[in-house]
Amino acid sequence: NAVIVLTRALQQDKKNLELQKDLVMSYYLKRDYTKALEGVKSLLDRDDADVICFQLGGNVYKALEEAKECEKVYKKGLKKFPKSGPLFSEYGELLWATKDYSAINLWEKGIQLDPGYSGNYYNAAVYYFYTKDKVWSLVYGEIFVNMESLSQRGLAMKQQLLKAYKEK
C-alpha cells in the first residue's frame, strides 16, 4: 500500500516535500479527504510550497465541497505564483462550477501569463461555446487542439469545433 510506504519514508525524512505531496495525493485518490486535508494544511504552511501543493489543496477542498476555503487556497497560490497557468485554470473551474462567469477572466489571464498551459485554452473555448461570440471559441479551441490533440479532451474539442464550424 502506497500510504504505508510513504508514511515510513516520511519517518526517515520528515521534511521531504515530494514525499508529503505523494502522501496527500494517495489519501486524495483513496477518497480519505480528512487525512488529505491534514496533509494539505501542513503543505500549504511550508515556505517551499510549490504550485502542485496549491493544486492539491484546491482539489482536496473541492472534494470536501468547501468552495470558500478552496478559493482562499487558489488566491494564496496565485499570490505566490502569479504566472501559474494551472492555478488560473483550476481557480476558474471553481468559479465556473459555482456559476460565477467571471471565470473567463481567470482563464484569459492564464493564457496571457502562461501561454504554454493548455487547460486555460480548453476552458476558455468551452466558455465561449456557450456565448454568442463563437469566434473566440474557435480560436481558443483550435489552439487547444494543437497543444493537446491526442487526449480525450482534445478529441471532445475537435467534435465541438466541427459542430461550431457547421453552425457558421
PLM regions: where:
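TPR/TPR-like (Sel1-like) alpha-helical repeat modules
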Residues: 129-153, 159-166
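Short coil turns that delineate tetratricopeptide repeat
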Residues: 14, 48, 82, 115, ...
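TPR-repeat structural position
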Residues: 33, 67, 100-101, 134
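Canonical tetratricopeptide repeat
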Residues: 22-25, 39, 55-56, 90, ...
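TPR alpha-solenoid repeat register
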Residues: 19, 53, 87, 120, ...
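Register position in tetratricopeptide repeats
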Residues: 29-30, 62-64, 96-98, 130-131, ...
